[in-house]
């Protein structure tokens, strides 16, 4: 994202509750963002129900909108991961429905899976994290939102 002022506020192992805590404690204070991209939820999969994950993501989006009301909020669906593709597809389907009125929903699953919805292992380093090629594909999509 050359020639752009970008802040990466993501942390490894974060769950929705960690992001909420940081937002409530000033993470989004002191600057005005034009656009915010949110990708959260995958680390909640082993600890929370689908409903709890959905509620957590929605709480994060509301907290962002309160603190950065001028920003265009783009929420990416949970990225597919090995052996949980169907569950993630269902959560993302519900997430898209809930967000389509207030946010831009970005579906990256089709980019990273085959026609059957199974992850394309050539785009992942470990079945969870995209590799360089996977991140390049994601970046191409995100650039289209930045350019519009």
Where are the language model's segments positioned?
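Residue-level signal for well-ordered alpha-helical segments
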Residues: 13, 34, 72, 112-115, ...
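Catalytic His-Asp segment of secreted/periplasmic serine-dependent ester chemistry enzymes
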Residues: 82-148
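A non-catalytic structural micro-motif
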Residues: 68-74
């Amino acid at each position: 994202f050359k020639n752009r002022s970008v802040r990466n506020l993501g942390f490894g192992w974060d769950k929705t509750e960690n992001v909420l805590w940081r937002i409530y404690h000033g993470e989004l204070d002191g600057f005005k963002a034009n656009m915010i991209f949110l990708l959260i939820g995958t680390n909640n999969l082993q600890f929370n129900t689908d409903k709890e994950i959905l509620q957590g993501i929605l709480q994060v989006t509301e907290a962002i909108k309160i603190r950065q009301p001028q920003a265009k909020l783009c929420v990416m669906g949970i990225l597919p991961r090995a052996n949980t593709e169907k569950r993630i597809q269902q959560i993302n389907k519900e997430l898209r429905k809930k967000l389509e009125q207030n946010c831009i929903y970005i579906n990256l699953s089709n980019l990273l899976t085959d026609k059957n919805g199974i992850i394309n292992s050539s785009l992942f380093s470990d079945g969870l994290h995209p590799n360089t090629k996977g991140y390049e594909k994601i970046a191409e999509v995100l650039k289209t939102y930045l350019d519009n």
